[in-house]
Amino acid sequence: MAYIQLEPLNEGFLSRISDVLLCGWTCQHCCQRCYESSCCQSSEDEVEILGPFPAQTPPWLMASRSNDKDGDSVHTASDVPLTPRTNSPDGRRSSSDTSKSTYSLTRRISSLDSRRPSSPLIDIKPIEFGVLSAKKEPIQPSVLRRTYTPDDYFRKFEPRLYSLDSNLDDVDSLTDEEIMSKYQLGMLHFSTQYDLLHNHLTVRVIEARDLPPPISHDGSRQDMAHSNPYVKICLLPDQKNSKQTGVKRKTQKPVFEERYTFEIPFLEAQRRTLLLTVVDFDKFSRHCVIGKVAVPLCEVDLVKGGHWWKALIPSSQNEVELGELLLSLNYLPSAGRLNVDIIRAKQLLQTDVSQGSDPFVKIQLVHGLKLVKTKKTSFLRGTIDPFYNESFSFKVPQEELENASLVFTVFGHNMKSSNDFIGRIVIGQYSSGPSESNHWRRMLNTHRTAVEQWHSLRSRAECDRVSPASLEVT
């Protein structure tokens, strides 16, 4: 037979009654707290601190609150104890003291402003977002400093370095007829065509008209009999690989009909600017720039091509390029030999109107300020792009190499009179420029190896000014 153990009736009933009473007391207490919180709202900041503190507010905390309200005293860290004091003589807390309780610590915001800056207490103010203060403090001081300018400050400027030709500012907005009537430098007829199959640009210089006559040597009158124009073509910004037409004698209406090809990819050609410069070559071997035409190739249809008549505008480039020379240097320390190869030259300045140029190169070895040896190439007839490929050797001991200089001078051969000077460079101890110094330095660092480099020719006056070795040769 199974037995069932029954719970005593009285004990179960009493436990339920106690639970109901406890729940009712808890609900009443919570409702009272909510009512007090809703009815006692204020503008003060309430900081609720939970912990096993005495339910009664300690005296030290009451003193601090009263002082904050009055604003007459400031507590320092040494005046206020860090822990609350207990009233129990034996220092032990009763059971009511150890029970968890809550109390509110209230401070007025206005008390924060009443504290002096010397107070060690830290005030934390809320960050206001999107709120603009009516009173703004200036970042810069209200009193500005006076800028001191020396009396000779503006005297250091050179107006010629900053002067602009105002007449050229409105060239882009003028038509060719307006440019022609304003400057009266003439017109140039040319065409362009790009070959996609062979990746080259063809420029055809056809003719020019109404070119101004040159001025006589004394500058007193126009010299109608000595107008000898020619055209130089290049693709900016590259001015080294330029082309040059032949010289047309005694005319202001030259007909050139010459074609020139530039090996250049199509996309690169669209980033270039075609520059055609008309130059006059007189009987005194002076090369005077008449005018120029600049055409950005991105603005034209290169594949379709086209013909243009363009009015010449003034050019800021008064001096023309003298040409370039390709050299190779090699030194053999064991043999004490300095080997020089004259490979080629290009776009040399023309010196003879009737027969063109017959250029040759003279090489002169200068030790210190003393001329030691002179050699020269053969001359090539009727060309401004000569190809020599001639080698020369000079005896230079290694201990004398640092004092050696090589002077390269390009002349135009003339059967009737003395040879015409075209250009010069100096390489060695007294180099005529940075490019020449770099070539010499590379040769010294790489013995037994030929070092090639292009050099732009310079005028005689420029070389004489910067290189003492140029003064020792003719």
Swiss-Prot record:
Residue numbers of Phosphoserine PTMs: 118-119
Protein's cellular compartments: Membrane
Summary of the tissues where the protein is detected: Expressed in brain and kidney.
GO biological process: cell differentiation; positive regulation of dendrite extension; regulation of calcium ion-dependent exocytosis; regulation of postsynaptic neurotransmitter receptor internalization; vesicle-mediated transport
Gene Ontology MF annotations: calcium ion sensor activity; calcium-dependent phospholipid binding; SNARE binding
Pfam families, A to Z: C2
Record region (Disordered): 60-117
GO cellular component, one term: glutamatergic synapse
Name of the protein this chain belongs to: Synaptotagmin-17
Organism phylogeny: Eukaryota, Metazoa, Chordata, Craniata, Vertebrata
Gene assigned in the entry: Syt17
